[in-house]
Amino acid sequence: MVSLQFITHQTDRYTYFESALMALEGGCKWIQLRMKEAPCEEVEAVALQLKPLCKEKEAILLLDDHVELAKKLEVDGVHLGKKDMPIDQARQLLGEAFIIGGTANTFEDVVQHYRAGADYLGIGPFRFTTTKKNLSPVLGLEGYTAILSQMKEANIELPVVAIGGITREDIPAILETGVNGIALSGTILRAEDPAAETRKILNMKRIIK
């Protein structure tokens, strides 16, 4: 089954914790706690709330950026953006047991992360998104197709998660490019019932698969 990663986001309606809770209630098994503007103490407080819930739901919990905190709290791993700690440095700190994901926008990024020891790639953005500042150039379907083709030619085997401005309607076409997973945030949180929206997406993906 193609995996769904939920990336936390604070809105007028929901806190970071509440956003993750609704995704978990909807059946999501992969949470990235992303609190880019928050101090480390706040991230730690939310992570401590989420960790037992993720364990109960058998869901993976990653922290965005906070490598030392991930090690301290013994969560499942981290996701590292282009301006975060380099992946090879994070691997030295965390060892092999932690999951390390990296953000990529080009095939050159993919090669760099692969050589550095990433476990998966978050490739995007698919289109413009309001949940992230300082966006790289949008990829669209053609971008994913091109990068995945280059990966195949180079014998680079890493799971690829599509990210950035993806709606429920986009998912079938994106999966056709050969990506392994989809990362969502705003699409779920803008829904009237985020938990129900998560369930719909997971059910739809099972039908596609």
Curated annotation (Swiss-Prot):
Residues reported in the UniProt entry to bind 4-amino-2-methyl-5-(diphosphooxymethyl)pyrimidine: 32-36, 64, 103, 132
EC class of the enzyme, as a word: transferase
Pfam families assigned to the protein according to its UniProt record, in alphabetical order: TMP-TENI (PF02581)
CDD domains: TMP_TenI
Catalytic activity line of the entry: 2-[(2R,5Z)-2-carboxy-4-methylthiazol-5(2H)-ylidene]ethyl phosphate + 4-amino-2-methyl-5-(diphosphooxymethyl)pyrimidine + 2 H(+) = thiamine phosphate + CO2 + diphosphate; 2-(2-carboxy-4-methylthiazol-5-yl)ethyl phosphate + 4-amino-2-methyl-5-(diphosphooxymethyl)pyrimidine + 2 H(+) = thiamine phosphate + CO2 + diphosphate; 4-methyl-5-(2-phosphooxyethyl)-thiazole + 4-amino-2-methyl-5-(diphosphooxymethyl)pyrimidine + H(+) = thiamine phosphate + diphosphate
Domain of life from the UniProt record: Bacteria
Residues binding Mg(2+), per UniProt: 65, 84
Cofactor binding note: Binds 1 Mg(2+) ion per subunit.
EC number: 2.5.1.3
Gene Ontology molecular functions: magnesium ion binding; thiamine-phosphate diphosphorylase activity
InterPro entries, sorted: Aldolase_TIM, ThiamineP_synth_sf, ThiamineP_synth_TenI, TMP_synthase
Keyword terms, alphabetized: Magnesium, Metal-binding, Thiamine biosynthesis, Transferase
Binding of 2-[(2R,5Z)-2-carboxy-4-methylthiazol-5(2H)-ylidene]ethyl phosphate, residues: 129-131, 165
GO process annotations (BP): thiamine biosynthetic process; thiamine diphosphate biosynthetic process
Disulfide bond residue pairs: none
Pathway where this protein functions: Cofactor biosynthesis; thiamine diphosphate biosynthesis; thiamine phosphate from 4-amino-2-methyl-5-diphosphomethylpyrimidine and 4-methyl-5-(2-phosphoethyl)-thiazole: step 1/1
GO cellular component, one term: cytoplasm
Cofactor: Mg(2+)
Any coiled-coil regions, as ranges: none
Its job: Condenses 4-methyl-5-(beta-hydroxyethyl)thiazole monophosphate (THZ-P) and 2-methyl-4-amino-5-hydroxymethyl pyrimidine pyrophosphate (HMP-PP) to form thiamine monophosphate (TMP).
Homology family: Belongs to the thiamine-phosphate synthase family.
NCBIfam families hit by this protein: PRK00043.2-3, thiE
Protein name: Thiamine-phosphate synthase
Species the sequence originates in: Bacteroides thetaiotaomicron (strain ATCC 29148 / DSM 2079 / JCM 5827 / CCUG 10774 / NCTC 10582 / VPI-5482 / E50)
Lineage, broadest ranks: Bacteria, Pseudomonadati, Bacteroidota, Bacteroidia, Bacteroidales
